[in-house]
Design a protein with these regions (language model features):
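Compositionally biased terminal segments of proteins
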Residues: 1-250
């Protein structure tokens, strides 16, 4: 379980329409619901959803940040707002990264919040959320699990596909890439695949569809000894996993 998730759930129990959690925390929540293990994760990645009563949510959010004693960094660009909250005290998530693509609106940083420096390499998520295809895909896959707003497994999988492909391309271009992150995203696709209901069909378009095709092509070309799903306790090998992905998305 993610440290601090209980305080998060309690604070935002009436506001699940205003955010969606993705990334490792979403994986942890979804797999825990299915009584499956997941690696330890301390951070919450969340996307703001701008509804009519958003200022009410914003007030509650800042209460939580102050109660948790967080420091805050932010980068506001023309189309994307990014916030990073760090060093939450005991009982609160270690870090919260928050994204919004609402044009002309951002969370007003309140007094009493200690600022931190944010480097230029914030997150690949910023780029993906600027894409209308991925944003609409995310909006169509939101659900509530145990009082927390998350992206459902069948919609989270293409985000993990994108993350793996993005790191793979950067590595091929000669950039330094954390091999643990590369491995993590590769396997998260199949971890989540375990809990997608049999017979599920998911529609996508544009860049989402392109990335799904690209992932299937790339993962199929990897030596099967490097995609050891059965050894990790999954109920299928790489080839069967790829077949299931095709049945769901293509």
């Amino acid at each position: 379980m993610v440290p601090g998730i209980d305080s998060f759930r309690e604070k935002f129990k009436d506001y699940t329409d205003y955010y969606t959690i993705i990334g490792g925390t979403a994986c942890d929540i979804l797999l825990s619901e299915a009584d499956l293990p997941f690696r330890a994760t301390k951070d919450i990645d969340m996307i703001l959803i701008m509804e009519d009563n958003f200022p009410e949510f914003a007030a509650i959010f800042w209460e939580y940040i102050k109660e948790g004693g967080y420091k805050c960094g932010w980068k506001n660009e023309d189309n994307m707002h990014f916030y990073r909250f760090t060093e939450g005290k005991f009982g609160y998530p270690t870090m919260i990264e928050l994204f919004s693509r609402k044009l002309g609106y951002h969370l007003e940083i309140e007094e009493g919040i200690i600022p931190i420096h944010i480097d230029d390499d914030t997150s690949s998520l910023s780029a993906i959320l600027l894409n209308d295809d991925f944003y609409k895909f995310m909006m169509s896959g939101r659900r509530v699990v145990d009082g927390i707003g998350v992206l459902g497994a069948e919609h989270l999988i293409p985000f993990k596909m994108y993350a793996w492909i993005n790191l793979l391309e950067r590595k091929r271009a000669g950039e330094h890439v954390n091999e643990k992150d590369l491995k993590k995203h590769k396997y998260d696709v199949f971890r989540l695949l375990q809990i997608v209901t049999a017979g599920t069909k998911v529609e996508s378009e544009g860049l989402v569809t392109e990335n799904i095709h690209r992932y299937i092509e790339e993962i199929s070309a990897v030596d099967e000894s490097e995609v050891r799903l059965l050894q990790m306790g999954m109920p299928f090998d790489r080839d069967r996993g790829v077949e299931l992905l095709k049945e769901i998305y293509l």
